[in-house]
């Protein structure tokens, strides 16, 4: 059943689908010419989750069965029921029970992951039936590394699904042996030492799970390391580490135990009672207990693994750091936070749109975007002036003169992110949107506050707290500080023309800076504006002539400074910054073309003949010996046969015009024509054999066919093919890619990567979209229902429309030119795109695809911005199973995917089907996408009850009923539209276009900038930053490189062959004369040594760290310095 939509939304979907069908028609016509591995387009379209699962699993009739189950039960329950039905033979046909059980478990995982990720195929390598010691049959599930892409819940429920299938098919529980238990313990701890786990289980937790789990959690080897203790076990097939079992047990069953328990209880399963012990032994998701929360305990986890060149912007909860503000702008939410663009600029451009910050709370990380309706930073200049910055221009102007950044400004985080992370609220500051609701409770009159006098008058008249705009950071002072400041001003200050003038005195100056009061310093005198003078005197209980109104009032004041100020000024003064958010830089934003390593134009093998560059031109001129034919090379490719003329070849298209088919055979027995296992030796058959290819002739013919000359620098192929049938791509495609300077990916497509940023509303002006073009795209009205007439109106973004970077447009223009040439010159069809400038790309369709997934999402380009990021609706990102905490995805032109993608090019190895568009989602159904998007709040303002709840440290779920969330709109037309936001922003691409981390040159430059910024930030301890950089980045690097140098291989510069030790001849025996060189050089080992010692001494890191560096320096010197021959000069003997 299609999702409910309004007429306008339905018209939008139909418009996208009509254009898709037009594209597919053209691609199908091209494919039918027989020049590609398949005569059909190889990306099937899917309308819903059920369709996607059926395509991925390849079981006819599965989609209808899934839809039937989902009508009656939840997603999780439906996944289990479908699995049971497959295992019992109600859906699909299989050769034996084992295959049916395997399909059942994989299908359950596919349903749980919305049919988007590759985990069902790649993460579950096999499901087998095996025997217990008592002869009963149990189920064994083999997990592989890609199961991680399914997420913890799906990992855990895959085990539950296998148990459900076991029960339905009458099989016994797994009965583990004691040695196997201890093997699990050793193996998971070994995996933790070589790879990352979100949670490290205790030995007892591991033993509890594996002793009681009713199915066997097994896996294929994923690491080279082997266990040392429990080796060569009868029922364990490998001694190598199996990463899949560690992921499923640690990140799946243990971390998601409460969710698994909920389903176990609902299904009334016995044998899972041990989950209660796991739940009791694990920490609650929120992290802190109530007493700790009420103190807002700082969390320093985000500072772990600090990297050189990526600054810390605030230590945990430290004054001067980012001030939390609750709300959602049109470009925040879904794990994205916003700060003022002036904050980005004043921090030396290290933060740009899309830059990832590791944050203290509520989650682990967030992408950053500009929101100029927030408060900007406050800085102190070298001349002592304090400036509150509210725009980028001012930030750029004063940046060279800043001596300290006193306050980073505000950071906006939405309610939905706290709900998603189940993080207990931290207190909200008293903000304007709260003050307005306080005032509305007192009067229905329209009240304007344009001066401090009016602000105090309104507070006195209506009994509301002082307006936040006129409230200083009193909570950062002690009551003693307040009393001292009042007495100092009364005794030493004077007022001229309404401006307070104070002699510069260290403590009072420092207190005024902590309060973030703008000030000037002239002739050793601090000068405050008339407005700030009025506010400060009122708050300190001083008369206009600076005399104390009531000298006795300063005795017995409340210990909280802001409460003490309330008592002195006679109106309630609220806390402006009860919570600060610590942060450091994570990944820089990304907007870059996707390349294989090394970059490739065509998936055509050139072997050693192509040299280090894999050049087709070099291969065309290659001759192994004087007697060999020039341009003839020997490479491994698949044998194919033309059904029309019977000719054997390696190409997809036969010279006679026929479309060839692969011919499988046994390499040992010589039997051919049988796919599967050889009937004689029982080894797998393969079409792949070494064959001689006339590259020179092929290349010349391909150039002639597409009407091009060999005038490009290099046409790059691959050294060898790694697909199952080793099918080469037509050279003509590579020639046209080289002409247009675009590069192919492993599946035949051309991609462009960008950081994910959410957007629910846009202004046509900011994305370069004219009003006429916007209307043409279907944007007839703005978000408030008014006809669209101005490029400054705010429009609500359709769920499958995307906005790309200008850099992306430059590359996609080249891609479109390549595709038009391909259609015209290779397929003999009319050009399709005919684009010449950026604006021509608007309205064209793309495929969005995330790494580790196998389902693309249909999208439409509607504009471009200067930021290095890709903007799309949160639903678009969620449909790819991504959020926006710094993730990056790719786009490809739709025609490119339909024309050039082929399963025949995908690597034949674990993970080969990941990051490939095996299916295309045509229409986003909010009910079928990642549930994190359901927690996005879509209201114009948060109610007062929300702010009060934050002050009481309540859980986000306690206020869910009063918040307007996407989850409450599911199943209605409002699930797509009518979204609102609490805070506006004038330009989604404001601030720096790129992070300074990307624009600075060497690592030394980046490190210097990082530490210099740390010196200026009030919220940062630069000594701690220096120590963390040395301990978490430089020391491990130095030690690792030193180890790598001593165990390195040698490499031939000519053919690339590697050797464990240098050949005695000094040249490469394989290619006969290539120079053999080191793969790890002295410079790689010593590159961080000097800079580490320099910053260790400059920043006064602990002596233990300095001693570690000095010992390492001695080790490096002993390795590289020659003690026997030392250059001496005359001065050495004087």
Curated annotation (Swiss-Prot):
NCBIfam families: polC, PRK04023.1. It comes from Methanocella arvoryzae (strain DSM 22066 / NBRC 105507 / MRE50). Belongs to the archaeal DNA polymerase II family. This is DNA polymerase II large subunit. Possesses two activities: a DNA synthesis (polymerase) and an exonucleolytic activity that degrades single-stranded DNA in the 3'- to 5'-direction. Has a template-primer preference which is characteristic of a replicative DNA polymerase. Keywords: DNA replication, DNA-binding, DNA-directed DNA polymerase, Exonuclease, Hydrolase, Multifunctional enzyme, Nuclease, Nucleotidyltransferase, Transferase. The keyword Transcription does not apply. GO terms for molecular function: DNA binding; DNA-directed DNA polymerase activity; single-stranded DNA 3'-5' DNA exonuclease activity. It comes from the Archaea.
């Amino acid at each position: 059943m299609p999702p409910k939509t309004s007429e306008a939304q339905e018209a939008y979907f139909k418009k996208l689908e009509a254009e898709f069908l037009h594209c597919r028609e053209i691609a199908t016509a091209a494919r039918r010419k027989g020049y590609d591995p398949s005569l059909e387009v190889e990306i099937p379209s899917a309308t819903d989750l059920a369709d996607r699962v059926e395509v991925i699993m390849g079981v006819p009739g599965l989609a209808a069965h899934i839809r039937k189950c989902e009508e009656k039960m939840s997603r999780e329950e439906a996944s289990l029921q479908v699995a049971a039905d497959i295992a019992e033979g109600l859906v699909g046909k299989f050769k034996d029970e084992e295959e049916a059980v395997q399909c059942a478990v994989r299908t359950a995982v596919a349903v749980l992951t919305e049919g988007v990720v590759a985990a069902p195929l790649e993460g579950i390598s096999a499901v087998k039936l095996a025997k217990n010691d008592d002869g009963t049959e149990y189920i064994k599930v083999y997990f592989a590394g890609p199961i991680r892409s399914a997420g913890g819940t799906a990992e855990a429920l895959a085990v539950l699904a296998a148990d459900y299938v076991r029960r339905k098919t009458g099989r016994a529980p797994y009965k583990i042996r004691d040695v196997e238990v201890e093997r699990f313990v050793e193996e998971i701890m070994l995996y933790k030492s070589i790879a990352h786990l979100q949670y490290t289980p205790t030995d007892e937790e591991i033993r509890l799970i594996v002793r009681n789990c009713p199915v066997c959690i097994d896996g294929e080897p994923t690491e080279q390391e082997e266990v040392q203790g429990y080796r060569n076990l009868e029922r364990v097939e490998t001694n190598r580490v199996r990463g899949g079992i560690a992921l499923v047990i640690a990140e799946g069953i243990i971390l998601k135990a409460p969710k698994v328990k909920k389903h176990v209880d609902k299904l009334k399963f016995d044998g899972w009672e041990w989950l209660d012990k796991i739940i009791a032994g694990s920490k609650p998701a929120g992290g802190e207990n109530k007493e700790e929360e009420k103190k807002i305990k700082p969390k320093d986890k985000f500072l772990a693994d600090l990297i050189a060149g990526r600054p810390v912007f605030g230590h945990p909860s430290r004054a001067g750091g980012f001030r939390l503000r609750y709300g959602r702008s049109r470009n925040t939410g879904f794990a994205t936070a916003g700060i003022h663009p002036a904050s980005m600029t004043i921090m030396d451009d290290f933060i740009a749109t899309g830059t990832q910050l590791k944050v203290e709370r509520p989650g682990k990380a967030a992408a950053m975007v500009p929101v100029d309706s927030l408060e900007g930073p406050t800085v102190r200049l070298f001349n002592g002036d304090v400036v509150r910055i509210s725009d980028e221009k001012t930030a750029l102007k004063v940046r060279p003169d800043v001596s300290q950044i006193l306050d980073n400004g505000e950071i906006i985080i939405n309610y939905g992110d706290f709900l998603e992370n189940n993080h207990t609220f931290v207190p909200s500051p008293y903000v304007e949107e709260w003050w307005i609701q306080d005032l509305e409770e007192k009067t229905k009159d329209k009240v304007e506050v344009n001066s401090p006098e009016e602000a105090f008058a309104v507070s006195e008249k209506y009994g509301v707290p002082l307006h936040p705009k006129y409230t200083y950071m009193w909570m950062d002072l002690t009551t003693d500080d307040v009393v001292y400041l009042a007495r100092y001003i009364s005794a030493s200050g004077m007022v001229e023309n309404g401006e307070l003038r104070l002699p510069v005195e260290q403590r009072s100056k420092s207190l005024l800076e902590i309060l973030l009061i703008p000030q000037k310093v002239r002739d050793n005198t601090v000068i405050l504006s008339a407005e700030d003078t009025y506010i400060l005197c009122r708050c300190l209980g001083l008369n206009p002539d600076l005399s104390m109104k009531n000298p006795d009032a300063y005795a017995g004041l409340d210990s909280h400074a802001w409460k003490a100020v309330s008592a002195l000024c006679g109106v309630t003064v609220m806390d402006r910054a009860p919570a600060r958010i610590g942060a450091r830089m994570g990944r820089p934003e990304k907007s870059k073309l996707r390349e294989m390593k090394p970059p490739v134009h065509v998936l055509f093998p050139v072997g050693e003949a192509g040299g280090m560059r894999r050049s087709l031109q070099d291969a065309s001129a290659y001759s192994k010996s004087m007697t060999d034919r020039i341009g003839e090379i020997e490479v491994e490719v698949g044998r194919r046969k033309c059904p029309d003329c019977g000719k054997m070849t390696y190409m997809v298209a036969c010279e006679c015009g026929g479309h060839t088919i692969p011919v499988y055979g046994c390499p040992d027995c010589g039997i051919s024509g049988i796919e599967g296992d050889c009937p004689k030796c029982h080894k797998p058959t393969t079409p792949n054999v070494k064959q001689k290819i006339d590259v020179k002739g092929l290349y010349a013919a391909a150039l002639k066919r597409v009407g091009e000359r060999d005038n490009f620098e290099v046409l790059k192929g691959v050294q060898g093919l790694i697909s199952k049938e080793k099918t080469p791509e037509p050279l003509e495609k590579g020639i046209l890619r080289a002409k247009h300077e675009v590069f192919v990916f492993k599946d035949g497509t051309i991609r462009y990567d960008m950081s994910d940023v959410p957007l629910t509303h846009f202004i046509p002006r900011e994305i370069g979209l004219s009003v006429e073009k916007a209307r043409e795209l279907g944007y007839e009205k703005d978000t408030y229902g008014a006809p669209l007439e101005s490029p400054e109106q705010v429009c609500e973004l359709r769920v499958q429309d995307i906005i790309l970077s200008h850099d992306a447009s430059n590359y996609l223009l080249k891609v479109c030119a390549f595709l038009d040439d391909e259609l015209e010159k290779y397929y003999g069809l009319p050009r399709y795109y005919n684009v010449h400038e950026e604006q021509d790309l608007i309205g064209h369709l793309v495929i969005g695809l995330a790494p580790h997934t196998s389902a693309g999402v249909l999208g439409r380009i509607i504009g471009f911005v200067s930021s290095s990021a890709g903007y799309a609706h949160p639903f678009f990102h969620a449909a790819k199973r991504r959020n926006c905490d710094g993730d990056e995805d790719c786009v490809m032109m739709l025609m490119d995917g339909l024309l050039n993608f082929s399963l025949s090019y995908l690597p034949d190895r674990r993970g080969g089907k990941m990051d490939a568009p095996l299916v295309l989602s045509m229409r986003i159904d909010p009910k079928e996408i990642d549930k994190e998007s359901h927690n996005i709040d879509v209201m114009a303002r948060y109610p007062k009850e929300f702010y009060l709840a934050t002050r009481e440290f309540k859980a986000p779920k306690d206020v869910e009923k009063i918040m307007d969330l996407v989850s409450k709109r599911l199943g209605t037309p409002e699930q797509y539209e009518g979204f609102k936001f609490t805070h506006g922003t004038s330009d989604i691409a404001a601030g720096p276009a790129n992070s300074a981390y990307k624009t600075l040159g060497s690592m030394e430059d980046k490190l210097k900038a990082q530490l210099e910024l740390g010196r200026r930030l009030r919220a940062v301890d630069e000594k701690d930053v220096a120590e963390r950089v040395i301990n978490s980045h430089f020391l491990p690097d130095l030690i690792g490189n030193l180890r790598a140098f001593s165990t390195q291989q040698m490499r031939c510069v000519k053919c690339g062959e590697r050797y464990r030790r240098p050949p005695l001849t000094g040249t490469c025996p394989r290619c006969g004369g290539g120079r053999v060189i080191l793969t790890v050089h002295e410079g790689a080992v010593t590159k961080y040594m000097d800079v580490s010692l320099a910053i260790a001494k400059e920043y006064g890191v602990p002596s233990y760290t300095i001693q570690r560096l000095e010992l390492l320096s001695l080790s490096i010197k002993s390795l590289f310095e020659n003690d026997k021959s030392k250059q001496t000069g005359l001065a050495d003997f004087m």
